[in-house]
């Protein structure tokens, strides 16, 4: 029956997903033990018990189909690999998880779909094994990395004691403070380090996403500049810079303004003429 499923049951592009971390990536010994214990989790009695409880509460109506269970098994490997025992948080975006777990698909138009991963996460959340919360940030115009944490029910299902989890957390506190001492910084308590770890993920993502947004704006502008003459681009740059000066976003003397005009015109000419505005096209030499 398994052979038939693997041969014919192909309602998805990758019916047998496998977690494959990026080349050179490593993880903690504690996370490696979690990954070992999570192998084949959906075929165990513990998983069936959690599904039965979800059915009794009206959250689910049946055991998930075989393709969903395979997705959950692959996703659990990725979750355990990227788990941070100090912050009790999976330090990885859903998109990266979906790609590494073989649960992402890309259309002919280049749009990425991670529906299989999000559905598997939602299912684990309904079982009470993880917490899964999304949050939209209007400042950067997209969702920030999802907060995924492990619950005590998951550790119990994986036969991992609370003492082992606490020991892994203390070990990370010691390691973090050693790194701070090397940098000449004061040591911090566990609560402060946990708060710092949560802030770091969001702040790094916001700065990275802001940079990506800036690149995207430049690429879109380069597409429009492709058919424009140099003098047209000069006029547009001067108009833009005049507006920024009036709004107080650019403050400098006359010579600095001239240099900025030359810099922006040169940048826009290179991007538009060499077709560097495309993420897929190879830059011209």
UniProtKB/Swiss-Prot annotation:
Keywords from the named record: DNA replication, Plasmid, Plasmid copy control
Matching InterPro entries: Plasmid_rep_init_RepA_IncFII, Plasmid_replication_init_RepA
One GO term (biological process): DNA replication
Role of this protein: This protein is essential for plasmid replication; it is involved in copy control functions.
Membership in a protein family: Belongs to the IncFII RepA family.
Protein name, as recorded: Replication initiation protein
Organism: Escherichia coli
Taxonomic lineage of the native organism: Bacteria, Pseudomonadati, Pseudomonadota, Gammaproteobacteria, Enterobacterales
């Amino acid at each position: 029956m398994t052979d038939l499923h693997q041969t014919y049951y192909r309602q998805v592009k990758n019916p047998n997903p496998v977690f494959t971390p990026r080349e050179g990536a490593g993880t903690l010994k504690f996370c490696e033990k979690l990954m070992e214990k999570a192998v084949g989790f959906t075929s165990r009695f513990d998983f069936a018990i959690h599904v039965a409880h979800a059915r009794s509460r009206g959250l689910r109506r049946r055991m998930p189909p075989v393709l969903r269970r395979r997705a959950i098994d692959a996703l659990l490997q990725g979750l355990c690999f990227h788990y941070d025992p100090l912050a009790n948080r999976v330090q990885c975006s859903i998109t990266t998880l979906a790609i590494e777990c073989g649960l992402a698909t890309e259309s002919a138009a280049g749009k990425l779909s991670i529906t299989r991963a999000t559905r598997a996460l939602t299912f684990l959340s309904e079982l009470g094994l993880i917490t899964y919360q999304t949050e939209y940030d209007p400042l950067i115009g997209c969702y920030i990395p999802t907060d995924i944490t492990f619950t005590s029910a998951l550790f119990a299902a994986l036969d991992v004691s609370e003492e082992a989890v606490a020991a892994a957390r203390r070990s990370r506190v010691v390691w973090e403070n050693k790194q701070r001492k090397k940098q000449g910084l004061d040591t911090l308590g566990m609560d402060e380090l946990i708060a710092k770890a949560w802030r770091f993920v969001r702040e790094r993502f916001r700065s990275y996403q802001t940079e990506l947004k800036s690149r995207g704006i430049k690429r879109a502008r380069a597409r429009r500049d492709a058919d424009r003459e140099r003098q047209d681009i000069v006029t547009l740059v001067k108009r833009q810079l005049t507006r920024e000066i009036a709004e107080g976003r650019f403050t400098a003397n006359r010579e600095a303004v001239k240099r900025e005009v030359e810099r922006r015109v040169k940048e826009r000419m290179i991007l538009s003429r060499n077709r560097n505005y495309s993420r897929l096209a190879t830059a011209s030499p």
